[in-house]
């Protein structure tokens, strides 16, 4: 995907060409609102993206040309912005939880960052969060965690108590929900660029 990864946020130089967009996806909105890279296969030179509108129900999947990308912000870049959040951001449980999580996440040495609504709000400043919004995080682990690292993951998962935490593990081959893996299921759902699959070995795909 030309170095782009799922959850990257993109701003475009112009409206997506050749796409029938919903009415809410206006030029004015897309000047402010980034597109999120999703997992899918595309033609060479294209990227699969999702558009997000002001309302929870406003979502739209499409493709764009790589040459349309003007600016990119990754989840890892957003992790460095958490400390600079204004005080009024703490009214949202997801952002309040995120701020308290930073020392714990940074101490792991793993690449990490906020995604979902929290990441979108941090990157754009747009008011898309609600009082009951989840906190979505991605952790990059390119190998199965050892016993000590597994305990660290448990600590991270237990640290958020004021909102729902959706912790995704990115293996480099795809992403899966930490909660599924921690539950000890024989197979978990791994989201890949070729589509979702059930696997017992999410770190060993070829």
Question: For each predicted feature, which ranges?
Answer:
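Active-site nucleotide-donor binding segment shared across nucleotidyl transfer reactions
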Residues: 101-135, 139-145
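Generic structural "secondary-structure junction" signal
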Residues: 120-124, 131, 183, 190-192, ...
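Short, solvent-exposed amphipathic alpha-helical segments in soluble enzyme
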Residues: 129, 153-157, 184
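Helical scaffold of the NTase/Pol beta-like nucleotidyltransferase catalytic core
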Residues: 1-117, 150-163, 167
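Non-catalytic surface loops within mature trypsin-like serine protease
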Residues: 53, 141-143, 171
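Extended, charge-rich low-complexity interaction segments
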Residues: 195-206
